[in-house]
Amino acid sequence: MYILPEELRAELKRPLGELHRSFSDVDVGNSFLITVGDVTTRNALEHGLKPDVSIIDNRIQRRDSDHEFRDTATILRSRNPPGTVTESLWKSIEEAIEGATERGERFMIVVDGEEDLAVLPSILLAPPDTVILYGQPDEGVVLVRASETSSKAEELMKKFEEA
């Protein structure tokens, strides 16, 4: 398990990619698509996007979410306490990406705990042409290109404490 050190919290509150104020401004083209977060995943689906992998925790800004996802993606379940990246989450992301790239299946990972930090392993495990979308609370949606951000994600993960 990787534990987020206190000194990284402020850095991770800044967007890792392009911040878009409106979801309508987001253009993912034909890229492999990963969405992280309930609101981001819901917005993607409402805008006609079909994420190859989506990661949710049924919570929005630390409160239980009451919306249902009407999606045909295969469901995977993972445990991941707040402020961590667990082996369970890492393996679920790996399994989902593998299934999506090799078999063309779509996956939704439902996290028991918190999915906020799933962006980092998603960047590191994703194929180079991947776009990752995640929410920036009260600001918009962040578009991250895995190929442009993988070295930054690796640098950040190296600063996590291993437990």
UniProtKB/Swiss-Prot annotation:
One BP term from GO: coenzyme A biosynthetic process
Family classification: Belongs to the GTP-dependent DPCK family.
Pathway info: Cofactor biosynthesis; coenzyme A biosynthesis
Name the record gives this protein: GTP-dependent dephospho-CoA kinase
Organism: Methanothermobacter thermautotrophicus (strain ATCC 29096 / DSM 1053 / JCM 10044 / NBRC 100330 / Delta H)
Tree of life domain: Archaea
GO MF terms, alphabetically ordered: GTP binding; kinase activity
Function: Catalyzes the GTP-dependent phosphorylation of the 3'-hydroxyl group of dephosphocoenzyme A to form coenzyme A (CoA).
